[in-house]
Amino acid sequence: MSSVSQARSLGKYFLLMDNILVVMGFYMVFPLISIRFVDQLGWTALLVGIALGLRQFIQQGLGIFGGAFADKLGAKPMIITGMLMRALGFIFMGIADKPWLLWVSCILSALGGTLFDPPRTALVMKLTRPWERGRFYSLLMIQDSTCAMVGALLGSWLLQYNFKLVCLAGALLFLFAAILNAWLLPAYRISNAQTSMLEGIRRVLYDQRFVTYVFTLTGYYILSVQVMLILPIRVNEVAGQLAAVRWTYAIEAALSLSLLYPIARWSEKRFSLENRFMAGLTIMLLSIIPIGMIHNLQVLFLLIGIFYTGSIIAEPARETLGASLADNRARGSYMGFSRLGLALGGAIGYSGGGWLYDMGNQLDIPQLPWVMLGMIGLITLLGFYRQFHQHHYQTYSXYLSGTTKNNSYKQ
């Protein structure tokens, strides 16, 4: 094995190890925020939704600046600083007894994510070849689902004793991840060329095709973020016990472990990235509409499983499509900007989802948030259909050959 290939291989193993800590730390805390502050403390879903939306919007909305800093300074200092800031945010969350304290903790967590997320994503692009990238994203998703389940199980177990323990455990995982990155992560440069911050940002903003794709993702994320807000609340309502919330993540993990990689391998040779993404989005929107009408826990879990199946189909295609559209001369800036759709979708999805949930309860129309989410999904699907057919996106076969829209793939 050549030294370059060995470096790539070791780098990918480190990314997988690092991802375990990051995902477990996140899911140990965030899925339980709505349970803690809405169900246990009696806050409105809108109030908690604003906090979660604020975290999402700041982290993803400022991602282009985090990515631009990483293009300039390298990945390592940004990742370490961001993880330490996320740990501090979790400590503040553990003592939050007023809305402003929860918001401060979410802002700190968001700023940490702004610093470490774009360079980590750009490292995946740097360390994987185009033809293996889709499969590596699938492996990361399998790992995400498994670690999310384990993190949520540990968090819900600790919640029986004290929410402070939940937040402390999450903070310790991010602290450990920061130490590992300081010790083991090489000082990678994530872009192919020496690019100034302003030049990297300019490249992204003038790339109309990429910008359009990112903003259209807003509707997709409005649907997907509900697994962190009103979906756990709905499961808790139907089941009448907190333990049932854990099973939603167990379902996701089981489906990911059994289906994600086989589906990715099978579909990548038969369908375009665009069609795979739209098929997954279609399944998600069709499964989310009836949730408010269901009062049987088994049927609810079935719909959740179908929703996750749609996500399993859509997510690897979305990640790979976004990477194929990025300019390798400014990887960090592109990957940072790519999170803007999640920023907008998260802010609208959390605050809007919480508001719709409260309105549905006030009007005694529990179906309201779910039907509206389905309509948003349909509009998004139509937007992607028009976009993909108008702009003639780069085909998957061209992507596998290592050619991007801006330049040949270079490491």
From Swiss-Prot:
Signal peptide from the UniProt entry: none
GO molecular function: transmembrane transporter activity
Disulfide bonds: none
Top-rank taxon: Bacteria
InterPro entries named in the record: MFS, MFS_dom, MFS_trans_sf, MFS_Transporters, Multidrug-R_MdtH
TM spans (from-to): 13-33, 45-65, 73-95, 99-116, 139-159, 165-185, 213-233, 243-263, 288-308, 340-360, 365-385
Bilayer disposition of the protein: Multi-pass membrane protein
Locations listed in the record: Cell membrane
Keyword list, A-Z: Cell membrane, Membrane, Transmembrane, Transmembrane helix, Transport
GO cellular component terms attached to this protein's record: plasma membrane
SUPFAM superfamilies, sorted: MFS general substrate transporter
HAMAP family: MFS_MdtH
Family, per entry: Belongs to the major facilitator superfamily. DHA1 family. MdtH (TC 2.A.1.2.21) subfamily.
Protein's UniProt name: Multidrug resistance protein MdtH
Protein's gene: mdtH
